[in-house]
A protein has these predicted regions:
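A short, active-site helix/loop in glycosyltransferases that binds the activated sugar's phosphate group
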Residues: 160-190
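Short hydrophobic beta-strand element within catalytic cores of glycosyltransferases
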Residues: 306-309, 314, 319
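Acidic anion/phosphate-binding donor-loop and adjacent secondary structure
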Residues: 11-21, 147-151, 175, 189-212
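Nucleotide-activated donor-binding/catalytic signature segment of Leloir-type glycosyltransferases, i.e.
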Residues: 81-88, 253-272
Length: 391
């Protein structure tokens, strides 16, 4: 009964919101972004960077799924005209109407560009978009159980004009995905690699690796991030009396079994506040089951934090003991094995403190060299602006 009342209320408020959505569609535009959410996350930070990069074009940004929190709402709204579709992107009958309305509005533009990131709503609208509409899709990573963008977009692959992936590993996954699903190899010519960037705001500052080391874990509370693995690692390190303090930033709840060496900070949306945690920490931790090119690792390295992470996504192209800039842990199915490997690595690090300053410097140098804003901006400007015909 309560759920029914909530749905009815959501439907009612959606109808009240329709005039605002309608008025936001009247202006002539060239660039339309469709993003999944404005909630806390690495992908959303990338999406904000894209909105900032093309702010001069006065883009419109559609949020196509209910966001779990206010997250980066202010940053989205300060860099674009944001329309949060809400129920109009959820309720089937409403959604069908909105597909037609948005497609009609986009089709009326002279040379429109539609850019999507993790938006199932956009994929389902693609059949209504006319041939003169350029469609660009950013694929952050592959998901579990055939639930990700690579599967949801499959029926529309041949209509997507350009596709962006974060690195060679994801490109290889996409190639295999096309082969397995009878997508012609020629469509790989539409795929471009553009790595993320890291905004390095300060010169390298040496860290003191004596005393208790602070391990920073920054993530949203979702299954693939595996916070329970972090808890187990911290608990085992505590039993071994390793001088480590784990600071956790994200929407995680406290519990009776929380190890004493874990401090829960909560979610932080203000980048300047988050940066203060990066500045004081020594190690950035990632325990994810899957990732693309995780921003938290790159951001940590930009402050000289030493990365210790599961070997996921594109990380092994840039990080590893052989590169002297961090540590990757094998990512088998057995989580107990993963936990044990992390604990072994933390134990080794405590015994090799004299090497950590060098690893920290190398981590900083890696992101400064490989993930510059200039490379990111030039690549996206070429991809998007080249799609806009000259007047």
């Amino acid at each position: 009964m309560i759920k029914k009342i909530k749905r009815s209320y959501s439907n009612f408020t959606a109808l009240l919101d329709y005039p605002r959505i309608h008025s936001g569609l009247n202006k002539e535009r060239k660039l339309f972004f469709f993003f999944y959410t404005w909630a806390f996350g690495g992908a959303e930070r990338v999406h904000i960077s894209l909105l900032k990069l093309f702010k001069a074009l006065d883009p419109i940004c559609f949020i196509t799924t209910k966001s779990g929190n206010e997250g980066f709402k202010n940053e989205f709204e300060s860099n674009s005209t944001v329309i949060n579709l809400g129920r109009w992107a959820e309720k089937v009958s409403y959604k069908k109407h909105m597909y037609k309305k948005l497609a009609k509005m986009i089709n009326k533009q002279k040379s429109p560009i539609v850019f999507g990131g993790n938006s199932e709503f956009l994929y389902e609208m693609i059949p209504l978009l006319e041939p003169h509409v350029t469609i660009i899709d950013l694929l952050h990573n592959f998901a579990d159980f055939k639930q990700g963008s690579e599967w949801r977009s499959l029926p529309y692959t041949r209509r997507i004009d350009k596709r962006i992936v974060l690195g060679e590993k994801l490109l290889e996954q996409l190639k295999n995905h096309y082969v397995e699903n009878a997508i012609e190899e020629s469509y790989l010519n539409r795929v471009e690699i553009i790595p993320n960037f890291v905004d390095i705001e300060q010169p390298f500052q040496k860290k003191d690796f004596n005393g208790i080391l602070e391990v920073l874990f920054v993530a949203r509370n979702s299954p693939e991030k595996r916070f329970h693995v972090v808890k187990s690692i911290a608990e085992k390190c505590q039993k071994l009396a390793l001088p480590l303090k784990f600071t956790v930033i994200g929407d995680f709840e406290d519990s009776e079994d929380m190890p004493q060496n874990i401090q829960l900070v909560g979610a932080i949306y203000d980048k300047s506040v988050l940066n203060e945690f990066y500045k004081r920490a020594h190690i950035v931790l990632l325990t994810s089951r899957r990732e693309g090119l995780p921003m938290v690792i790159l951001e940590g390295m930009s402050f000289g934090l030493i990365p210790i992470s599961t070997d996921v996504g594109e990380l092994n192209a840039y990080i590893g003991e052989h590169k002297g800039n961090g540590y990757l842990i094998n990512n088998p199915i057995d989580e107990e094995q993963i936990i044990a490997s992390f604990v072994v690595k933390f134990t080794e690090i405590m015994e090799e403190r004299n090497e950590l300053a060098k690893v920290s410097q190398n981590a900083y140098d890696t992101v400064k060299r490989e993930f510059s804003f200039e490379n990111f901006a030039n690549a996206y400007r070429k991809t998007i602006l080249d799609s806009i015909p000259a007047k």
